[in-house]
A protein has these predicted regions:
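Short loop/turn segments that flank or connect secondary-structure elements
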Residues: 2-204
Length: 204
């Protein structure tokens, strides 16, 4: 269902309010172009929960040797996470910008050390939900969760590729959205998107 406003800009799905950008914007990560730059640019780490911090600390012995010397030193001195200026718990950074769990391939592409270890079967934790969800950002309120699409210039290539392939953000993010909210929630979102586009046919 939609919120009761003269101009629709949010959709209500269960106890969440979802930005229409998630439906209308095209998005498909193009790692060949961006090289995983979202892991190394920014002024704060990735938001995590206390449970995720504990899980990262639990698997740290398995991945610590995969990290750069600077990242290992930062973790030893300051831990895997810190509270940023907005009061959010976030992953630790190297040099104030690069996530400590970033690893680089010979071609310069960035990957998440946690996810690499998970894909290799070495750990049972994929990566923080906020990383999996990106470019979606969640804001928790007492009675609902706001689901917004963060637009960043380094992701322009993902918007271009998504448009070329006809993939919208909510479709690209089916896996992480289902991980966070559940299959029933995602199916309701997809059905709502179908009805929305029936009423308001996209121009693209």
């Amino acid at each position: 269902m939609t919120t009761e406003t003269e101009e629709i800009d949010m959709l209500q799905i269960q106890d969440t309010l979802v930005s229409l950008d998630l439906l209308e914007r095209h998005f498909l990560c193009d790692l060949s172009k961006c090289k995983g730059q979202c892991c190394i640019d920014g002024d704060a780490g990735a938001p995590i929960t206390e449970d995720e911090r504990r899980k990262i600390e639990e698997i740290l012995p398995e991945i610590i040797d995969d990290l750069s010397p600077a990242a290992q030193r930062e973790i030893r001195e300051n831990g895997v996470a810190y509270v940023d200026e907005e009061g959010d718990l976030v992953t630790q950074l190297v040099n104030g910008c690069q996530c400590v769990f970033t690893v680089f391939e010979p071609d310069g592409m960035c990957h998440c050390a946690i996810e690499k270890a998970w894909r290799a079967g070495r750990v049972d934790f994929m990566k923080p939900v906020s990383c999996h969800l990106y470019p979606v950002r969640l804001t928790e309120y007492p009675s609902f969760t706001a689901v917004n699409l963060h637009r960043w210039k380094i992701c322009k290539c993902a918007e271009v590729l998504g448009r070329q392939k006809g993939v919208r953000a909510y479709e690209f993010l089916r896996g992480p959205l289902t991980r966070r909210f559940g299959e029933e929630w995602y199916e309701e979102l997809a059905a709502t998107a179908e009805e929305y586009f029936r009423q308001y046919p996209p121009e693209d």
